[in-house]
Every structure is written in C-alpha cells, then in structure tokens.
Amino acid sequence: MGDETEIGFAGAPDRPGHPGGGPGEQSPLQARAQFLKNRSWELVTSLNQGACATGGAQHGFNRETQETCASEWAEKQTQSLSLEETIEFLRRCHRGAPFLFFNGNTFADVGRQLAGALFADLPTGRRREVMSAIAHYIAGVLDRESMVEIVESLCEAAEFILRGEVELPPAARASK
C-alpha cells in the first residue's frame, strides 16, 4: 500500500533520525507484532521447569491463577501488540504467579528472548543491556521509567554510531 510506512531498525519507521522516541519519532517500544505468536504456554511451562530444576525448587502450578494466565496467554498469542504492551503483559503474568516458584525468571526469560530478536541489529553490548533492562523490569526490580530510558537511549546511541554521527576512538575504528 502506498500509505504504509516501511519498517526499519528495531521496528521503527525507516526514516532519518533515531528510534528513541524524540519529537515525531517512534520509540522502539512501540514496534508492533504478534510477539507471542510462536511462544506457546507449553514453552513458558518448560522455561519454568528449567528454572525450577536449576534453582532446586519443585515445579508446579498455582491452582488459583494458572488457568487464567494460560487462557490470557493464548488470547495474546493471536494479537498484534506493541513491544511495550507485550512487556506489560509479561510483567502482569509474573505478578499473577501462575507457577509455584521462579515466575519472575520465567517471564523475564520470555522478554529477554523477544528483546534479543527485536534488537538483533544493535551492537552486542547494547543489545545485552536492552535485554537486561527489559528482563529486570518484567521481574519487578527496575521501574518502568528507567527501563524506557535505558532502551530508548541505547537505541538512540546505537543509531548515531551506525549512521557515523559519532566519532569512534581509533581503537574502536580499528576493530570494525
């Protein structure tokens, strides 16, 4: 369609400027997709089983919340959501505690995987920091404002470097 915007770096419209959400710019957290489409509830359950095995805890379900969370998950799998909406949903799942143990680790792991795929174009160190910020927010150890600031600033800085607007030190230029 002629009126559709091309999708570019980290899901932001492909146009000059950074994806960090400045005036007239789209935040990378506004990228929309069916982020949970290929992540079944069975996968989430297996991630929790792995976290419990690693942590030496018994895997099991919270009878009061597991069914509701699983049905909400199935519903969200079919929806196109922004990354921010998806992250908020993962945080709600963590707080809903559908498993006996390691809910934070489980849903943070899903968020980390999504961020790793979506921000694959970022330099490795920045991508890891974005993944960490998103995971820590989902797990409840980082506030929303800080997470948004970290994600947007790392994407903005990376975009400036990728476009050559930042003079790299000689050692960094040599390694490129």
Language-model features, listed with the residues they occupy:
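FIC/Doc superfamily catalytic core
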Residues: G2-K176
